[in-house]
Amino acid sequence: MAAGDWFGWMSRHFRRRRMQRFARAFGITAATRVLDIGGTPDCWELLAERPRLTLLNTPRARADLAGAAAWVAGDGRCLPFRDGAFDVVFSNSVIEHVGDRASQERFAREVARVGRGFWVQTPNRWFPVEQHLLTPFIHWMPKSWQRPIVPRINVWRWLVRVTPDRRRFYIEHYLNDVRLLDMSELRALFPRAQVIRERFLGVTKSLVALRR
C-alpha cells in the first residue's frame, strides 16, 4: 500500500469510529436536527441513519459541498440561527482554525447558544504528531522557527495531492491562523461540557467537548 493510500485508510478509520461514537452519544435518528460547522457531506455518509443535517461552511468550500441537502455560507463565530435552533451542533477539527483566543471564545459561545447539545472535536496540542501537517514535534516550536521550516519540511505535502495554490493557502493558513488547544483550554472554552479523549496507541490524539 502506498503511503498516500495508507494515510487515506487511516483517516477514514478514525473518522468512522468518531462518527459512530457521536451517533451513540446523542442517539442520532432521522429526526435529529444537526448543524455541522465546517463540515462536508462525506462524514455523514458513514452513519447508517442520517439526521436532519444543515452544513455551515465558508464560500470557499462550495465545491466540497456539492450534493449537500442543506448548506449555509457563514462564520462559526457569528451563526445565523436562533438560540436552541438545533438538537446538536457538531464540529470536527474546526475550532483550532478560527483564529486567536478571542475568536475561539466567540465560536464556543455560538456553539453553546444555537445547540441544545454539542460535540466539538479538536486535535490535542500535546499529541507528538501535528495532525494538520502530519509532522512530529513541529507544532511545539515557536512560530518564528516554524515559518522557514513548515513550507519545506512537512509530511502532509508528500501524502496529500493538491494543487500548488491549494498547498500554499493551506500552509499560510496553518502558520497564520491555526491555534491548537489542550485539555485545560478546551475545558475553559466549554465550562459546562464533559471533555473526553480520543486515544491512539495509548496517547491522547484528540479532545471532544460534549454536552448532551
Predicted regions and their residues:
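Class I SAM-dependent methyltransferase Rossmann-like catalytic core
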Residues: 1-27
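Active-site rim elements
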Residues: 6-12, 169-177
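Conserved SAM-binding loop
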Residues: 25-26, 32-127, 210-211
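Conserved class I S-adenosyl-L-methionine
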Residues: 117-150
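Short, glycine-/aromatic-enriched active-site segment of Class I SAM-dependent methyltransferases
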Residues: 133-136, 159-173
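Short alpha-helix
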Residues: 172-194
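Short hydrophobic/aromatic beta-strand or adjacent loop that forms the aromatic wall/cage
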Residues: 178, 202-208
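Conserved S-adenosyl-L-methionine
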Residues: 192-202
